[in-house]
UniProtKB/Swiss-Prot annotation:
Domain of life: Bacteria
Principal location listed in the UniProt entry: cytoplasm
Gene name in the database record: leuS
Binding-site residues, ATP: 579
HAMAP family linked to this entry: Leu_tRNA_synth_B
The name this protein goes by in its record: Leucine--tRNA ligase
EC class: ligase
InterPro entries linked: aa-tRNA-synth_I_CS, aa-tRNA-synth_Ia, Leu-tRNA-ligase, Leu_tRNA-synth_edit, M/V/L/I-tRNA-synth_anticd-bd, Methionyl/Leucyl_tRNA_Synth, Rossmann-like_a/b/a_fold, tRNAsynth_Ia_anticodon-bd
Originating species: Geobacillus thermodenitrificans (strain NG80-2)
Localization, UniProt: Cytoplasm
Length: 805
């Protein structure tokens, strides 16, 4: 008899809901365990089979930890602001709030159908004013600390969408959505000073149990480098510019300088003869993204300004060029070019026939740049020194002569925080007619997003909120001064920067969260999600957390102690699942046909959690067959408990494999090696089928081990075993080291290195006794007839090799 997954899964999901089985109490004397999923964006497409992979992994941990006696916090919520809902509203004229709510209801239904043990009383939604009140409150704190400021920055402006796009939303000079052309133009934007935390964001990575690859990505993103800032005067102008270089020792090899096209000096120093060429070049650059501009493989382009810089040491005149491979947002937006010892500068110099001067010996700069170390040459007071000595000596000279200084630079830029969007958190700031600005007072938060039918870009670069006159225009009740609300909204990252804190105290309307509760639960013990958030989300959340730590709001320096990235589930054809390819698998269909337990088991058994693996219907069927095998072992045709499950079997053949299973499954779950844990559960079932009778204690232990992966069938079998309560808080099985040892081992007997027989002997048999047994074996005696034994090599517990001729 097969089990009816539809009946069983509905029965237990109803039970958990009615009994609030997974409600997390705040008051508890148990140790805490906080296990978190990256909360999803509730899209119109609903859940796909990639979501449950990470969710099942955290659920297994949560369920095991409850059984191990921990007070477990395992919550779920919705990262529900963002571009797709707004785009949908633009396309259909529907309200993004209604659309979002409908999607959330669908996601919640789907997630509940998979049997995850979330505490739904703690559900949060970033678009709920009671939630984003605190997102806005954090913004006020950032502003008070001088970490939120407005600045004129070049942004990716998409005229067709009427909005600014983040770098990640621009691909090859076009918008990711719709493929519209994107240009760079300066606009006043809100920025967050994440650079003020660069060193701490870098140093504190050391203490985290994160994959090394993710730490490395964060290190590279922050990109700390030590070097010098050097000032170059412009010949014939009362102007100068600064460059940052990690190799001030090569200053004597500088033969030209390059400014970023957006550099403010370009306008001032370009000569009339060069102006047409410069203007044409600036127009061409506008449509390129930073990524395209810095692509190492692309042709170098540039144009001469007609102006010259004065070399700070020699007084030589160096031509000043502009080129798109220099970015205004990186370093100072200007470089000194040392073509003999830098690949990009070398290519540029070759393309435009600029001089190349060798200052570090060891290469052949006629053919290629030399980037290695070596003795300095053609460098006046640096001649004969190696790289490190020369760097120190040059910095000392620059500082003595007022021409430069030692400097640490970062690749990390301040975070562009404003979006010209409707569907985001309003930024709580008012701009007054006298040019001042103030923040909305704390007691007036949340500043609620107004409902509107007019969700279309304003076209001026402001958000659609600019169209809502009665919301935008305000008057100061004290002075009668007129003002306009900030019309930009926050990016989707804002709500996800701190959501893990709100789960700890989701209904608190007096503060972000109770400090005592934060102390009790932080940091998050395990955080699981996709690697696509390796840099930005995790870096932004760490930044906000550190700000809150400095304000005394959170008690830990870091939010997430252990991080794990699950791999991707690909389509059966090994391609990424996508609607356009028609290879998306909907979990609803699988829950209907095979059951949630089968889906959970299959996704955990596919392979290592971090690997990307193709979906296989055959594999799914195999998972279902295993569960049916388990069911038949426990339950008779007429639905009773198998009578061969007894308190004291006559012959206890399962003892060793049971203790091995408890040990391996427990260790593998802890280490997130779910596929090998499930293999061991299969080994146990195979052995149990061979046994005449099965000890009830072992069978109960097995059900406990299976239940975190397959909770519905776990509960049902637990009930069949005679229990009336849920299995969720039953104590986790333990094993006895002494019972893991094999009593009997199989020994291989070889003659001249070839296997001739096998023997089962007691595991603790001595070397001498083993040799005796081997020589007395009937098969071996036959093989040795007429031969002389020259030597016997014995390895206890493994083999006996007899050398004879």
């Amino acid at each position: 008899m097969s089990f009816n997954h539809r009946e069983i899964e509905k029965k237990w999901q109803d039970y958990w809901e009615q009994h609030k089985t997974f409600r997390t109490p705040d008051e508890s004397d148990k140790p805490k365990f906080y296990v978190l999923d990256m909360f999803p964006y509730p899209s119109g497409a609903g859940l796909h089979v990639g979501h449950p992979e990470g969710y099942t992994a955290t659920d297994i941990l949560a369920r095991m930890k409850r059984m191990q006696g921990y007070n477990v916090l395992h919550p779920m919520g919705w990262d529900a602001f963002g571009l797709p809902a707004e785009q949908y509203a633009l396309d259909t004229g529907n309200d993004p709030a209604e659309f979002t709510q409908k999607n959330i209801d669908n996601f919640r239904r789907q997630i509940k159908s998979l049997g995850f043990s979330y505490d739904w009383d703690r559900e949060i939604n970033t678009t709920d004013p009671n939630y984003y009140k605190w997102t806005q409150w954090i913004f006020l704190k950032l502003y008070e600390k001088g970490l939120a400021y407005m600045d004129e920055v070049p942004v990716n402006w998409c005229p067709a969408l009427g909005t600014v796009l983040a770098n990640e939303e621009v691909i090859n000079g076009r918008s990711e959505r719709g493929g519209h052309p994107v240009i760079r133009k300066p606009m006043r934007q809100w920025m967050l000073k994440i650079t003020a935390y660069a060193d701490r964001l870098l140093e504190d990575l050391e203490e985290l149990d994160w994959p090394e690859s993710i730490k490395e990505m964060q290190r590279n993103w922050i990109g700390r480098s030590e070097g010098a800032e050097i000032e170059f005067a412009v010949d014939g102008h009362d102007e100068s510019f600064t460059v940052f270089t990690t190799r001030p020792d090569t200053l004597f090899g500088a033969t030209y300088a390059v400014l970023a096209p957006e550099h403010p000096l370009v306008e001032k120093i370009t000569t009339p003869e060069q102006k047409p060429a410069v203007d044409a070049y600036l127009k061409e650059v506008q449509s390129k993204s930073d990524l395209e501009r810095t692509d190492l493989a692309k042709e170098k382009t540039g144009v001469f300004t007609g102006a010259y810089a004065i070399h700070p040491v020699t007084g030589d005149k160096l031509p000043i060029w502009i080129a798109d491979y220099v970015l205004m947002g990186y370093g100072t937006g200007a470089i000194m070019a040392v073509p003999a010892h830098d690949e990009r500068d070398y290519e540029f110099a070759k393309t435009f026939n600029l001089p190349i001067k060798e200052v570090v010996a060891g290469g052949n700069v006629e053919n290629e740049p030399y980037t290695g170390d070596g003795e300095h040459i053609n460098s006046e007071f640096l001649n004969g020194l190696n790289k490190q000595e020369a760097i120190e000596k040059m910095i000392a000279w620059l500082e003595e002569n007022g021409k430069g200084q030692k400097k640490v630079s970062y690749r990390l830029r301040d975070w562009l925080f404003s979006r010209q969007r409707y569907w985001g958190e309003p930024i709580p700031v008012i701009h007054w007619e006298d040019g001042t600005m103030t923040t909305v007072p704390e007691e007036e938060l949340p500043l609620v997003l107004p409902k509107t039918d007019e969700i279309k870009p304003s076209g001026t670069g402001e958000s659609p909120l600019a169209n809502i006159e009665e919301w935008v225009n305000v008057v100061d009740p004290k002075t009668g001064k007129k003002g306009r609300r900030e019309t930009n909204t926050m990016p989707q990252w804002a709500g996800s920067c701190w959501y893990y804190l709100r789960y700890i105290d989701p209904h608190n309307d007096k503060q972000l969260a109770d400090p005592e509760k934060l102390k009790q639960w932080l940091p998050v013990d395990v955080y699981i999600g996709g690697a696509e958030h390796a840099v930005l989300h995790l870096l932004y959340a760490r930044f906000w957390h550190k700000v809150l730590y400095d304000l005394g709001i959170v008690p830990t320096k870091e939010p997430f102690q252990k991080l794990f990235n699950q791999g991707m589930i690909l389509g059966e054809n090994n391609e990424k699942m996508s609607k356009s390819k028609g290879n998306v698998v909907n979990p609803d269909d699988i829950v209907e046909s095979h059951g949630a337990d089968t889906l959970r088991l299959y996704e955990m058994f596919m392979g290592p959690l971090e690997a990307s693996i193709a979906w296989s219907t055959k594999g799914l069927d195999g998972a279902r067959r295993f569960l049916e095998r388990v069911w038949r072992l426990f339950v008779t045709e007429d639905g009773q408990l198998n009578p061969n499950i007894v308190d004291e079997p006559a012959n206890d053949t399962l003892e060793r494999v049971y203790h091995q299973t408890v040990k391996k499954v427990t260790e593998d779950y802890e280490a997130l090696r779910f596929n090998t844990a499930i293999s061991q559960l299969m080994v146990f079932i195979n052995e149990a089928y061979k046994a005449e009778q099965m000890k009830k204690e072992y069978m109960e232990g097995f059900v406990k081990l299976l239940s975190p992966v397959c909770p519905h069938i776990g509960e049902e079998l637990w009930q069949k075993l005679g229990h009336t309560d849920t299995i969720a808080y039953e104590p986790w099985p333990t094993y006895d080291e002494a019972k893991l040892v094999e009593d009997v081992v199989e020994i291989v007997i070889q003659i001249n290195g070839k296997v001739r027989a096998k023997l089962n002997v007691p595991a603790d048999l001595s070397k001498e006794a083993l040799e005796e047994r081997a020589l007395a074996d009937e098969k071996i005696k036959e093989q040795l007839a007429g031969k002389t034994v020259r030597k016997v090599i014995t390895v206890p517990g493994k083999l006996v090799n007899i050398v004879a001729n």
